[in-house]
Amino acid sequence: VPQLCVYKMPRATCIHFVHSAQTSYIYTSTSSDTTRQQLNYLTDHYFAPLHLTPPEALPKAKEQFRNKYLAYNKGFFIFHHKSLYLLNTNLVIEEKNPSEVIDIDFLVVSFGCWMRYSDVSKQIHPRQVILSSDFPYSYRQIWIAECKKAHIPCHDVNTQGAFLCDL
């Protein structure tokens, strides 16, 4: 069963797109050396016990990637007909017609975003918000409260552990 996983990692965003036990892809916000160290931990404690082949690291140097399972372009991912947006910068807020708001399945909010959900929701309407482990505590509390008020499920990786979702 294909899965989306967002792991709790110190000072990093880590998104794992699992197609099968043999095929998966991982995006991390850290340098390749740090990513390799973190993947060693995941391999020993997660992939090996579950008989999963270690994932292919998505290249950060490229802003685009596409194969038959996964496509991404500048923070926007499509995997098994599900959309995910990685919000690690501030959006340029434009006054939009409500019909122009982008509907997505998952919004992963990470370090680099200094906006509130109430501002982001003017352009993006997620079905699920996931707060990455590197997202600052002060903003985390605001997002949790605003998501609750908007009736949007919000998963905090720091307090609730890894986000795992069958697709």
How should each PLM-predicted stretch be described?
Residues 1-14:
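Hydrophobic alpha-helical transmembrane segments in integral membrane proteins
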